Amino acid sequence: MNAGDVYRLIQDIRAEFGTTKKIWIYTGHIFEELTGAAKQAALASDVVVDGPFIAAKKDFRLAFRGSSNQRIIDVKRTLDAQKIIELNV
């Protein structure tokens, strides 16, 4: 599935459920570097897990991410603060 498809899927979920469903996406890319449809999809979601999975940084104790370089970003709070706000999970 490409980023444009993901963005349209998020729009469909929002149309059907409003904000009653939390939408998480995993990008494999750095949040600040996203462009185009990938950026649209990220900004339309509630939480973004960014950064590539790096096997050398794998940590099974981490919740919702595979390696310690990945961030769990609260999108709304990040947009409001105009800086990255990570969720502590």
Where does each model-flagged region fall?
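Structural recognition of alpha->loop->beta junctions
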Residues: 36-57
